[in-house]
Amino acid sequence: MKKYSEAIKIAFAYVGVVVGAGFSTGQEVLQFFSQFGIYSYIGVVISGLILTFIGRQVAKIGTAFDAENHESTLEYLFGKKLGLVIDYVLILSLYAVTITMIAGAGSTFNESFGVPTWLGALIMCIIVYITLLMDFNKIVRALGVVTPVLIVLVILIAAASLFQGSIPFSKINSVVEKPNLGIAIWNGFNYGGLAFAVGFSTLVAIGGDASKRLVSGLGGLIGGVVYLVLLGLINFALHSEYTEIKDAAIPTLVLAGKISPILTFVLSIVMLAVMYNTILGLSYSFAARFTSPYTKRYYLMISIIVPLAYALSFVGFEGLIAVVYPMMGVIGLFIVVAVVVKYFYRKSQDKKFIA
């Protein structure tokens, strides 16, 4: 029973990180999936399968190496020299996602509560900085605690959309602008790469903290399945009111508003919480890559990177997403391919599995 409890904790932490950059606002799902109609569900399945299988493998690798950061995992996948190159590209890209999420938090505070964007982003940075002063187990608990709430809200919104939505499933392709199978399939891979790249470093570290490979692998597997279900549900909900949400900055708030003003308020809080999850997880991974956690250098590092990310977030949420997200998708897919190749290579050689 204890191993299942630990696996579920890992799964919720995993989902909590990738959801922040993945679909907390709904805008990401709209751009990558919903606008391509019914075909988008093929992309959703592809993305979910990437997160499920690859997440399981990477969590097990993290446990095998007792990893505190992703360096040893990348060296295992790519070799020392190429692994180092991928390491620096990934960690700098993850920092760019951190900046993007801080900008998104500022925008969410502004649109939901009328708080100035600069102040909303500052509040988020202060909360993240304080949490980073705690040990990693506390961070895992912080990451996981909001995920069940998000799951309930997404299911509630999707269920309401099933009965109240103005667009039936059979009519979706007639209202979307770009019902395209090819692009939907590519976006499934690209989005899966994006979500995996965002969660990679944190999942390796969480796997390194797990007691056994079986537990960490199960946690990654459960996390991927939960992510697949959530992604499919939110895509369905967006389709059910597509004509109303297609031009919205934060589509999920529009959907919540059609159900209840109270739900809109609660969802706003949860959206900020999952953004916090992502910023927190990525900031820790960045600091842990260059320092030993909870040393003087670590505290100095977080005292630099958090204020710097806040300053750079003034570039703007939409502008950052347009540049950072496609790039992260490609980087993530590169690592995904390496994990798959390594898996089948070791299987063909009949070697003892690290993952």
Residue map of PLM features:
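Transmembrane-helix boundary/entry motifs in multi-pass membrane transporters
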Residues: 2-5, 35-39, 64-93, 111-117, ...
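Extracellular loop-to-transmembrane helix junctions
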Residues: 4-5, 32-59, 216-229, 326-333
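Hydrophobic, membrane-embedded alpha-helices of multi-pass small-molecule transporters
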Residues: 5-24, 43, 90-94, 98, ...
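Transmembrane alpha-helical segments of multi-pass small-molecule transport proteins
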Residues: 8-15, 44-49, 86-95, 111-135, ...
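Hydrophobic alpha-helical segments and their helix-loop junctions in multi-pass secondary transporters
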Residues: 21, 95, 128, 132, ...
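Juxtamembrane transmembrane-helix boundary signature
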Residues: 45-71, 233-237, 241
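Membrane-water interface regions at transmembrane-helix termini and the short interhelical loops
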Residues: 61, 101-111, 125-146, 209-212, ...
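Membrane-interface interhelical connector segments
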Residues: 177, 238-261
